[in-house]
């Protein structure tokens, strides 16, 4: 078994006792303990005629255990078909687990589904779920009534949530005239009407342009997670969302939990810490000597700007080792303008975790 796979097993074993990103005691907002789910495999008429009693099933979640602390911004990563959507549906009480338990705010998703729905709200990032011919206020008033609210409480809560998402000035504007970013905010407002403690976000910025997406991420971080104190579970493929928002992430593949932690710690566990050196001496023998001695990995020169070259290298050992490399190069007379860690691209991080897990399984 690989080192990463071993750490994953240990993380799963201790997830329930220590979910906090800092390793300290924390209350749990969401706890999954050995959750598994499979669905029937669709078969052709010919296959059913030949084997009428066969009932094949495809696993979608396989023994997933993790815990999310209250107030945490937690990311779910993985390729399409990894099980993220099924996991969200299970937390929202729309899908029942085959085995294992899941709790939200201390309530079991099977035995206490109504209480779970009172503390959790999924945010459907589909603008078509809004009533475009109604105003923002009318959309929220309708939803509030569906949530069981009555009388003056409706108007008060609608006013509050519109202020939270920054749409107070456009509350009488029909939704059809809203920009995509405004519609996303209205979807958040709709979820906040019932005052949930946990929000489920599924790729909330996928329909936004880069500038609108950046503003929306700021809104999620500062207002929803910061001032409102909501626990947020985010399923995403966006590196910007992960880096700007998530305290920790979990990587899923084919329904299996492969790793949890910060993106930095996961990259370090993979031995894939990469650094960039900006120097005028890209061909200095001291750099080649570091490679020969096995202190750094292969060097890659990435362009030249005004006489300064960017030299990338793999380097294990974290910041302490990096400082030693800088000191050694300085002693050898290498001119250094900047030395910095290069974050591993999110797609590469996920791909390498998946490949490492597959290699560990084949060697087990």
What do these predicted ranges mean?
Residues 195:
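Conserved catalytic motifs of ABC-family nucleotide-binding domains
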Residues 260-261:
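ABC ATPase "signature
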Residues 46-47, 141, 145, 152-170:
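Conserved ABC ATPase "signature" region
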């Amino acid at each position: 078994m690989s080192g990463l796979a071993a750490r994953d097993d240990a993380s799963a074993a201790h997830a329930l006792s220590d979910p906090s990103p800092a390793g300290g005691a924390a209350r749990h907002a969401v706890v999954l303990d050995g959750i598994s789910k499979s669905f029937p495999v669709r078969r052709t008429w010919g296959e059913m005629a030949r084997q009428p009693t066969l009932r094949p099933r495809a696993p979608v979640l396989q023994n997933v255990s993790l815990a999310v602390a209250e107030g945490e911004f937690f990311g779910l990563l993985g390729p399409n078909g990894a099980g993220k959507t099924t996991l969200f549906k299970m937390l929202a009480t729309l899908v029942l687990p085959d085995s294992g338990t899941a709790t939200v705010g201390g309530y079991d998703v099977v035995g206490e589904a109504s209480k779970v729905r009172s503390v959790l709200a999924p945010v459907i990032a589909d603008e078509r779920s809004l009533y475009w011919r109604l105003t923002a206020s009318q959309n929220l008033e309708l939803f509030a009534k569906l949530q069981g609210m009555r009388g003056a409480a409706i108007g008060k809560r609608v006013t509050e949530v519109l202020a939270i998402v920054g749409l107070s000035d456009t509350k009488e504007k029909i939704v059809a005239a809203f920009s995509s970013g405004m519609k996303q905010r209205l979807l958040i407002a709709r979820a906040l009407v019932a005052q949930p403690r946990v929000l489920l976000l599924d790729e909330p910025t996928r329909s936004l342009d880069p500038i609108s997406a950046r503003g929306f991420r700021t809104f999620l971080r500062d207002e929803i997670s910061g001032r409102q104190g909501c626990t947020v579970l985010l399923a995403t493929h966006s590196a910007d969302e992960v880096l700007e928002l998530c305290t920790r992430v979990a990587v899923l593949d084919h329904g299996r939990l492969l790793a949890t932690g910060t993106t930095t710690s996961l990259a370090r566990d993979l031995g894939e810490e990469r650094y960039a050196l900006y120097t005028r001496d890209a061909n200095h023998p001291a750099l080649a000597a570091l490679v020969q001695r096995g202190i750094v990995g292969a060097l890659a020169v990435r362009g030249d700007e005004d006489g300064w070259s960017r030299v990338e290298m793999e380097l294990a050992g974290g910041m302490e080792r990096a400082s030693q490399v800088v000191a050694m190069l300085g002693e050898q007379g290498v001119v250094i303008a900047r030395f910095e860690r290069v974050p591993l691209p999110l797609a590469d991080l996920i791909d390498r975790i998946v490949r490492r897990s597959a290699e560990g399984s084949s060697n087990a």
